[in-house]
A protein has these predicted regions:
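A short helix->loop->beta-strand "cap" motif at the edges of active sites that frequently abuts
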Residues: 104-108, 163-164
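Proline-aspartate-enriched helix->loop->beta-strand connector
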Residues: 80-82
Length: 172
């Protein structure tokens, strides 16, 4: 089986990155092919933690560009990818990009690392609401927070409805 991981920032420091490294190496040891595609590769020196057979592929911003879609589609076809594991499972953009697999036999699994009812985006918006004292600004920041909460909900709904499996990894 050939597996492609997709994540925004890899290789990098962090929990999702460690999980991706461990899984990629395990899949290689089990005889599978593994590619990790990412938009940013800030700590390429961490690639030494991967077994030599794991391939790294760099994509570019904007995430959903035609260039990225074509590159990912070519990878799926040329490398005979069976499964994409989308490790960046919250923003709808990642699932939208990975939907290039829709025109192939490749299956898409999206993973949400964290609580489904919040995100960094919402936490920052809540912090802003709590630290402002001006009533007008407080109203504006609450409206912005509401819109961000709705965006996160819509992203999760989109992701759940456009992949074969949606995995939630959360302690909440």
């Amino acid at each position: 089986m050939n597996i492609l991981f997709f994540y925004r920032v890899y290789p990098n420091y962090g929990g999702v990155e460690v999980v991706t490294t461990v899984l990629a190496n395990r899949f290689i040891k089990d005889g599978h092919g593994v590619i990790i595609a990412s938009i940013e590769q800030p700590h390429i020196e961490l690639a030494c933690q991967l077994l030599p057979d794991v391939k790294l592929v760099k994509l570019d911003y904007p995430v959903c560009s035609i260039k990225n879609m074509r590159k990912l589609h070519r990878l799926i076809i040329n490398e005979k990818i069976d499964i994409i594991i989308n490790q960046w499972g919250l923003p709808f953009m990642s699932t939208l990009l990975c939907r290039v697999a829709k025109r192939t036999s490749c299956k898409l699994i999206s993973v949400l690392h964290g609580a489904p009812n919040t995100s960094k985006l919402i936490i920052k918006a809540r912090d802003k609401c709590e630290t402002v004292y001006n009533p007008f600004l407080k109203y504006i920041y609450h409206a912005i927070m509401y819109l961000k909460e709705e965006l996160v909900k819509a992203s999760i709904r989109y992701n759940c409805s456009h992949c074969e499996k949606y995995v939630l990894l959360s302690s909440h």
